[in-house]
Amino acid sequence: MKFLTPSDAEQAFYEAFEIGEITAMMAVWSKDDDITCIHPHGPRLIGRSAIEASWRDILNASIGVRFQLTEIREFVDQALAVRVLYENLWVPGENSPRPPIIATNAYRYSKSGWHMVLHHASPMPQDDPENRGAAVFH
């Protein structure tokens, strides 16, 4: 599938997640094997095989989830786009969303359009540093 913009690819990514469709999910990912995925509290997964296996397990267990994406920040040039956002996740049977997940999604442009090369998702810290002002960690 050809995605004309990084936003198109990202929309398809979250739609595939919501409907639990592995074929649609993997259509978003680059066909190259130099792709990486890090799920919350998970190890670094490299390559289509490892990433597809992880998504197959997640999608089988996540039917009916819904996302609201907020505070999207985007950095784009001609060949690479990085989007940082909050994933607000609603699970069937629960009355309120789960605590937000902070996600970084990177997309690379090629003749076949924009495709995901990185998805890194982490739980938001209880004491979100964005609410405290700048902190120095290095």
Model-derived segments and their meaning:
Residues 1-27, 34-138:
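A beta-strand edge to alpha-helix "cap/lid" segment located at domain peripheries
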